[in-house]
Amino acid sequence: MKKKLLNILFWSVISAAFIGPGTITTASLAGASHGVSLLWALLFSTLACMVLQEGAARITIASGLTIGEAVTLTFGNQPWMKWLLAGAVIFGCAAYEAGNIVGAISGAGLLFPLPPWVFTLAITGIATVLLWGGSAGSIAKSLGALVAVMGAAFLYTSFFIDESPLAITKGLFVPQIPADDILLVIGLVGTTIVPYNLFLGSGLGKCQQLGEMRLGLIIAIGLGGIVSMAVLLSGTLSPLPFSFEGMATVLEKAVGLPGKYLFAIGLFAAGFTSTITAPLASAITAQSIWGKGEKNWEATGTNYRLVWGSILIVGLVFGLLGLRPVPVILLAQAINGVLLPVAATGLLLVLNNNRLMVHHTNGAFSNLAGLFIVGVTLFLGIHQVARAIFMAIGYQSSFDSLYFASISLLALLPLFWLGIRIFRR
């Protein structure tokens, strides 16, 4: 029993990694704007996260390689695929970093009446020192405990909502896509299925058995999904227009004055830990694909530091620009939601590499689940891109049958190619 509990705590790193300012913002905004009707997006993304993270960890357990090394072996004669996968993850990290620093600034701003640029310089300065010295991990874990306490406060607050059990059940199992807010749906998916977590999960899979990995991972991610849903439910109590101040007031009403400060500290902690994690993940991703055995790609190497430093600079710039936090954070999650099909496609192709996975290649069910995940995220992403193009040329798109069929066809074409690649292996 003790071993199983420790295993769950071990894999809780993944759920802690996706409960950052992005989850707090997108889930709260979804609840405030659409009630419980978008719960299905969190249920889908939680289940999809389990499928993809299990696959990522299975690669390491079966082959003894990291995802980056497995990608290099699988696409050795297709360098463009390696660049595409690494580029998607690293670009996604840069987008996340913008939201992370803005989220940390917002949390600090709820506590201290100082100009945002002061917090920006302090946060990026401390993060640089920690990343340079290699002591970021222990600090991130300590602050992660504060995020967990804030999550517990959201769970408690969710019991005070006015929605009926029937409405909540419908929101969970009957998908609804608001035509004017597709970006929010993509954001909910992108904030839960974090592409760089696939690399993190792959590394955590070392020295574990498949059975214990699956149990720990499913329970840990499931708990993370429940907390995300609790944030959305709590968001239904927040007034519009949505703001962090309004959300702090919601928690204050539910748990008393400490709730306000708990939200502020938790938002800062979530943003700060993610400010460290995103640059680190981008450097690890680049290292695993391009830098095996090279001194410049070691943790103290020039290339390694250039990658995480570049991501940190992106966050610094966005923090100094003084942009409104909620749109920046939402856009960061949506960008990763659009990039997700690229990472998921690469993962599926590696999982179907017979020479690499031997007896642990994907079965029919795992492949169908993976194709479904890629299909849904492709559909959402293409719909958002199409809508943006239509708005740019002055055409108001609607969710009519012709439009729906066209977007579905565009999503099915790459899905059909992927299916042929997988099932002809």
Regions found by a protein language model. Give the residues of each.
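Juxtamembrane transmembrane-helix boundary signature
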Residues: I14, A41-F75, L85-G92, W417-R424
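Flexible loop linkers connecting adjacent transmembrane helices
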Residues: A27-L29, E54-P79, S106, G137, ...
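Helix-loop-helix module between adjacent transmembrane segments
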Residues: C49-A57, W80-N100, I105-S135, G190-T191, ...
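Transmembrane alpha-helical segments of multi-pass small-molecule transport proteins
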Residues: L84-A86, L110-W132, V149-F154, E298-G315, ...
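C-terminal membrane-solvent junction of multi-pass transporters and transport-like membrane proteins
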Residues: A145, E298-L306, I335-G337, V342-I407
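Hydrophobic alpha-helical segments and their helix-loop junctions in multi-pass secondary transporters
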Residues: V147-F173, I182-G203, G346-R355, L380-A388, ...
